[in-house]
Amino acid sequence: MSSFKHLSVNQLVQMTEAKSVQIVDIRDGNSFNNGHIDGAFNLNNENLAHFIGQADMDRPLVVVCYHGISSQNAAQYLCEQGFDDVYSLDGGFSAWHEANA
């Protein structure tokens, strides 16, 4: 079983420019609707099984939360579900928003 990796905001920018990447945002729906990384999917308990069933397990997957803490647990869980290349965004959406404001 693989383990997730940490990813900085700069690395995420490079990754999105270089290859096809899946981004899941685990923040609550209101926070997601108020702002999120382009192309991100709002992953929650209600749509988790559907997402796992439809997702490309071989594409890089970046997990985003508020500050980069909760995303680590979610990233590890997704590794355990069979995703091969999983990342947790250090600093979360807050860091991404600050870097892109």
From Swiss-Prot:
Single GO MF annotation: thiosulfate-cyanide sulfurtransferase activity
Entry GO terms, CC: cytoplasm
Membrane-crossing residue ranges in chain numbering: none
Pfam families in the record: Rhodanese
UniProt keyword Transferase present: yes
UniProt keyword terms in alphabetical order: Cytoplasm, Transferase
Location relative to the cell: Cytoplasm
Similarity annotation: Belongs to the GlpE family.
Name the record gives this protein: Thiosulfate sulfurtransferase GlpE
